């Protein structure tokens, strides 16, 4: 007789899609161990299992294709043997469970369940049930366990079991088809489409893992039991404020997810029973569906208000839970095809065994995770055995998270809970997610960067000390021109004395309008020797920008050259000084020994600004000295040769120029045409034995594309100014295994580098910006300036030496 064929229900379709994506894995297995803590009659237990399967048609569902469509039918019952295995210890049982749960079902034309009984030496034992999600959900699994125990109990007592019957899953299949044609369906559709008129960004919980090389759906579980004291306080809080345990935990997790995702609005998936009446609650089969819960955290609402809002949202969602999530996605994608899955974090609350308290035969259910999940992280809040204890289990993709990540997440959740218990009306913005231990680590370990350096000396003092130490060593090289430390000092002194005679006084601002050259270095030193501040101006800046910078900084003089004078004609109020005039260098060559303020401004550098006009950043002598003297981000060796790659208008030159001249090294200034040509640059690096250079990330990428091995002769390469490309970094690391590559990050306001990271391995996704450099601080904070944990993205607060 031909079997009646049925369409898959919507919950089954969702399972089928997941099965197709992760074919050959046990991702849709539901496995539970039912243990009876007394001597078991395994013959009667086997019979009870048979009776249950015979009277529940959902267990006998089989699946096949008809005209390229997946269909299901009910197979006739025939009694079956249930294997029994002897187990000697709980450890051995756990190992056996792991073996059972990873068994992959053949979903076509075969039964999608498997029962195995187990027996301990003292005669107690139970059974393991492994089912495919196509024929069952967690509610059905719990229902099945309790009903099998119920039948077993009657058999033990020699009572009749003829009156034990169960509703058919076919009724649900038919009722769903009726629902699709009903007015209720249209109302539900309208509700969900209205709710998601705007689709929030997908939230995510950051992790420490960069190299996501494992199969994406492989997972592990970490499980915690809430401390009794804390749980009692939570129960009391929920009762007095009239919200449920689940709403409490959902609100706590929402705060955490929102803060680490930097989202005020996002979606969390949460499973619902999708059983709309008593009959369906007593029917085995796949009913459960996942609904998207839209969380809104804006406006610094209080926790009590959030929990109340979540409660109201759930109330409305439950009224419309029958509308399929797949249908909602289809609706949304009909308007915007780019809409992804609405969530990748799932939070569930389960208290399945409501019938356990009335069972005459004691038993306990232990659910076994199958170690595969489709979402990034599934969070289960549950009390499976009605113990009154709340457990939180985190199933997490091992390609994304480490076990320590999950432990850290849970500790932060406990921290949020403690704050809420102290003040249920705490504002969301005031909730801190970092634990006390994490805060201590960030404040006193991560930011313990204090190192001794000559902070009470100016750039000029340190440079002149270096001149005394190595007067005849080469200081700076440009093309075929070079100057020793003594020659550079004397030229700078002559120019400084000239400037002093022209009326330059301490704290004046002096512009430098020069291309890269020896003269630019002489100019910088001469201005500093006057106790003045230098203002670098790019020769290619438009007149409007130059005019703004000169007026904004109150610049009085510009050091330049005759060939550039025409570009400055309109700036009449500024005195032009031509450095190509040899008479400027006939003044005294002696040090000026000018007494300066405690920490004079060294230079003003204009950045693009955020208001349309450039923004002038004043950088003190102390900031420069902190950057290059006795620092921790780079180890200087003897006889370094540092390449100046950028114009003096970019703050990387602060490291290049003063990293060389305040440490007795040689500064090499490269011409632009040589820098941008990979062949010429490689030749320059080799011929001049350059040991250290800085490149902006875009230029580094461009050069790498041409020849990743061009840096073989270099000892240290610093790069940054933009997000680094792992592909290009990895390429150079492979080609130049002896090269040290440092990711240098920092705003101009904090003097070139705030953080640095020595790239010691290959990265697939993002490269860290590292740690604060010596005598600096670095804090990652939320938009409301709450401290964030290490590894969580946020706003970066940086600071220098406050001593």
Q: Which residue stretches match the model-derived regions?
A:
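Short acidic/polar active-site loop segments enriched in Thr and Asp
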Residues: 244, 264-266, 505, 556, ...
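Short functional linear motifs
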Residues: 13, 42, 141, 189, ...
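Short, highly charged C-terminal tails/helix-capping segments
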Residues: 429-441
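Adenylate-forming
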Residues: 3, 13-22, 31-39, 49-51, ...
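Carrier-protein-dependent adenylate-forming modules in NRPS/ANL systems
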Residues: 1-167, 206-207, 232, 242, ...
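Motif- and composition-driven signal specific to adenylation
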Residues: 335, 518-526, 530-551, 563, ...
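A short secondary-structure junction motif
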Residues: 199-203, 631
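Generic preference for hydrophobic
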Residues: 72, 84, 115, 268, ...
């Amino acid at each position: 007789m031909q079997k009646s064929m049925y369409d898959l229900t919507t919950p089954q379709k969702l399972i089928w899609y997941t099965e197709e994506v992760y074919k050959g894995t046990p991702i849709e297995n539901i496995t539970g161990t039912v243990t009876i803590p007394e001597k078991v009659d395994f013959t009667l237990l086997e019979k009870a299992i048979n009776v249950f399967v015979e009277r529940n048609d959902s267990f006998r569902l089989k699946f096949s294709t008809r005209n390229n469509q997946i269909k299901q039918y009910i197979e006739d019952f025939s009694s079956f043997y249930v294997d029994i295995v002897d187990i000697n210890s709980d450890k051995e049982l756990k190992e056996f469970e792991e073996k059972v749960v990873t068994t992959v079902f053949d979903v076509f034309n075969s039964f999608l369940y498997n029962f195995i009984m187990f027996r301990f030496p003292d005669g107690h034992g139970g059974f393991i049930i492994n089912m495919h999600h196509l024929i069952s959900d967690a509610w059905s699994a719990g229902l099945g366990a309790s009903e099998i125990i119920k039948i077993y109990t009657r058999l033990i007592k020699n009572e009749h079991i003829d009156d034990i019957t169960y509703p058919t899953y076919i009724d649900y299949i038919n009722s769903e088809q009726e629902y699709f044609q009903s007015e209720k369906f249209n109302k539900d559709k309208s509700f969900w489409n209205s709710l998601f008129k705007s689709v929030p960004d997908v939230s995510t919980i950051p992790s420490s893992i960069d190299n996501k090389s494992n199969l994406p759906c492989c997972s592990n579980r970490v499980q915690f039991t809430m401390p009794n004291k804390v749980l009692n306080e939570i129960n009391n809080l929920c009762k007095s404020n009239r919200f449920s345990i689940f709403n409490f935990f959902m609100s706590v997790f929402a705060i955490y997810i929102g803060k680490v995702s930097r989202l005020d609005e996002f979606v969390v998936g949460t499973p619902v029973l999708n059983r709309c009446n008593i009959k369906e609650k007593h029917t085995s089969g796949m009913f459960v569906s996942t609904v998207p819960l839209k969380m809104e955290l804006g406006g610094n609402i209080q926790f009590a208000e959030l929990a109340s809002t979540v409660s109201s949202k759930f109330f409305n969602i439950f009224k419309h839970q029958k509308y399929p999530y797949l249908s909602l996605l289809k609706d949304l994608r009909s308007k915007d095809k780019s809409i992804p899955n609405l969530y990748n974090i799932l939070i569930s609350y389960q208290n399945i065994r409501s019938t356990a308290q009335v069972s005459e035969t004691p038993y306990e259910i232990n659910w076994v995770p199958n170690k595969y999940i489709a979402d990034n992280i599934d969070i289960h809040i549950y009390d499976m055995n009605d113990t009154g204890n709340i457990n939180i289990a985190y199933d997490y993709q091992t390609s994304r998270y480490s076990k320590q990540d999950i432990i850290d997440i849970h500790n932060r959740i406990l921290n949020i809970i403690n704050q809420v218990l102290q003040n249920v009306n705490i504002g969301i913005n005031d909730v801190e997610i970092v634990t006390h231990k994490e805060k201590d680590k960030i404040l006193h370990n991560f930011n313990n960067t204090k190192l001794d350096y000559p902070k009470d000396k100016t750039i000029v003092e340190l440079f002149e000390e270096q001149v005394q130490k190595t007067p005849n060593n080469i200081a700076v090289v440009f093309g075929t021109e070079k100057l020793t430390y003594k020659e550079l000092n004397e030229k700078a002194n002559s120019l400084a004395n000239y400037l002093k005679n022209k009326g330059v006084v301490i704290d004046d601002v002096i512009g430098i309008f020069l291309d890269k050259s020896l003269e630019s270095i002489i100019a910088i030193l001469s201005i500093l020797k006057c106790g003045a501040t230098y203002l670098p101006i790019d020769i290619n800046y438009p007149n409007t920008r130059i005019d703004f910078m000169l007026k904004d900084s109150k610049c009085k003089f510009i050091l330049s050259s005759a060939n550039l004078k025409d570009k400055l004609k309109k700036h009449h109020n500024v005195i032009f000084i031509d450095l190509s005039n040899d008479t400027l260098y006939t003044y005294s060559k002696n040090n000026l020994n000018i007494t300066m303020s405690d920490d004079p401004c060294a230079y003003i550098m204009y950045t693009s600004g955020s208001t349309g006009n450039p923004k002038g950043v004043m950088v003190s002598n102390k900031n420069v000295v902190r950057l290059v003297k006795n620092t921790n981000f780079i180890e200087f060796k003897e006889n370094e040769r540092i390449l100046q790659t950028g114009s003096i208008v970019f703050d990387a030159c602060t490291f290049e120029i003063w990293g060389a001249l305040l440490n007795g090294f040689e500064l090499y200034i490269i011409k632009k045409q040589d820098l941008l040509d990979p062949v010429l640059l490689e030749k320059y690096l080799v011929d001049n034995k350059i040991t250290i250079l800085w490149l902006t990330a875009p230029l580094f990428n461009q050069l790498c594309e041409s020849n990743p091995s061009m840096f073989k002769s270099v000892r240290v390469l610093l790069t940054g100014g933009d997000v680094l490309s792992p592909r290009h970094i990895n390429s150079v690391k492979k080609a130049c295994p002896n090269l040290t590559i440092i990711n240098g990050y920092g705003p101009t306001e904090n003097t070139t580098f705030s953080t640095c990271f020595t790239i010691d391995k290959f990265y697939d996704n993002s490269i860290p910006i590292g740690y604060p450099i010596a005598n600096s601080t670095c804090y990652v904070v939320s938009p409301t300036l709450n401290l964030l944990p290490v590894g969580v993205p946020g706003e970066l607060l940086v600071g220098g030496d406050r001593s």
